[in-house]
Amino acid sequence: MPVDFHYGVRVDVTLLSKIRRVNEHIKSATKTGVVQVHGSACTPTLSVLSSVGTAGVLGLRIKNALTPLVGHTEGSGDVSFSFRNTSVGSGFTHTRELFGANVLDAGIAFYRKGEACDTGAQPQFVRTTISYGDNLTSTVHKSVVDQKGILPFHDRMEAGGRTTRLLLCGKTGAFLLKWLRQQKTKEDQTVTVSVSETLSIVTFSLGGVSKIIDFKPETKPVSGWDGLKGKKSVDVGVVHTDALSRVSLESLIAALRLCKVPGWFTPGLIWHSNEILEVEGVPTGCQSGDVKLSVLLLEVNRSVSAEGGESSQKVPDSIPDSRRQPELESPDSPPLTPVGPFGPLEDASEDAASVTSCPPAAPTKDSTKRPHKRRSDSSQSRDRGKVPKTTFNPLI
């Protein structure tokens, strides 16, 4: 069966080795995620996506890390290919191998098996080739391309010109993360994160408790995080309007932890107009390469928690209820005796007949039992020990 080569890129392993620390920090979350090659066909972007908690999406995007192969015929247009980071039934993890320390060269190729003339068909398989530094060892891994095609959505968020954002200093971020962990229980919890333009405060509310963080508003027009990174020991924010988001507590805790990479990123909050809260890793210094790390926290539906509370308060049918009406009588059952205000309405003759017809009750065993005699303290015969009997022994 002929093999149709569709698209291929060469990986800049030198750039990936410089940001290996970021991959080591998030490798537990991205192991079960998805690797994406998307963007322009001439300058594609390498991304790693993974779910965080119950309502969060982690995204690591690296630009200028992929170079298209010379044999690619379609030089213009956009590409979007997705495949699992860890293949099903295999222990091969793409990010672990591509970010390795002893990697000399790496390439990713997308192809399909079928007629070569079918140029419009999507690729079916991906082949990852890795050569190591000893010039002898190499690895070739083949896996399946996701046919559904996950569209890259991190770059489609609104531009950072009019967004409300807050940069947390290291001390505030550690204190907030500790407080959120103390409020966490085994159940799914929703935390409300609101920011006030007038008061210059951010409020985290859940379960009847709240935590308020004051920040210094930035009045000068800034572009992105560049105008906020100068004040390291102060919480600085740019607020254009009041904003509110309801997110999962589990996802928020994980996002603050993942976006805190010592020497690389510190967490910052962004409120989007579509009620999505984004926790972005703000670079702390001059980084090598265009790397972006962020977690999108989706809006949690309030009706889900309300339905859960009603279902927990529902009384099961097996518990008897005194307010229930009496069951209907069958035609074979005897009629009920009407009851008056002072007792059942019956004739005196019927009462007398019922009394005389009943035989006397036989005495029970408990009633015939003789009463227990109380032992007196003066009786010393019962307090003495058992005296052995003296009998005739013929052997003596």
From Swiss-Prot:
DNA repair as UniProt keyword: no
Main location: virion
Gene3D superfamilies to which the protein is assigned, alphabetical: 3.70.10.10
Keyword DNA-binding among UniProt keywords: yes
Keywords: Activator, DNA-binding, Early protein, Host nucleus, Transcription, Transcription regulation, Virion, Virion tegument
Biased composition (Basic and acidic residues): 376-386
Gene Ontology cellular component annotations, sorted alphabetically: host cell nucleus; viral tegument
GO biological process: bidirectional double-stranded viral DNA replication
InterPro entries: DNA_pol_proc_fac_herpes
Annotated stretches, region: Disordered: 306-396
One Gene Ontology term of the molecular function aspect: DNA binding
Subcellular location: Virion tegument; Host nucleus
Pfam families, per the entry: Herpes_DNAp_acc
Record note on quaternary structure: Homooligomerizes and adopts an oligomeric ring-shaped structure composed of 6 subunits. Forms a complex with the DNA-binding protein, the DNA polymerase subunit, and the alkaline exonuclease.
Stated role: Plays an essential role in the viral lytic DNA replication by acting as the polymerase accessory subunit. Stimulates the viral DNA polymerase activity and appears to function with it as a holoenzyme. Increases the processivity of the viral polymerase, probably by acting as a sliding clamp that prevents dissociation of the polymerase from the active template.
Family: Belongs to the herpesviridae DNA polymerase accessory subunit family.
Name by which UniProt lists this protein: DNA polymerase processivity factor
Species: Human herpesvirus 8 type P (isolate GK18) (HHV-8)
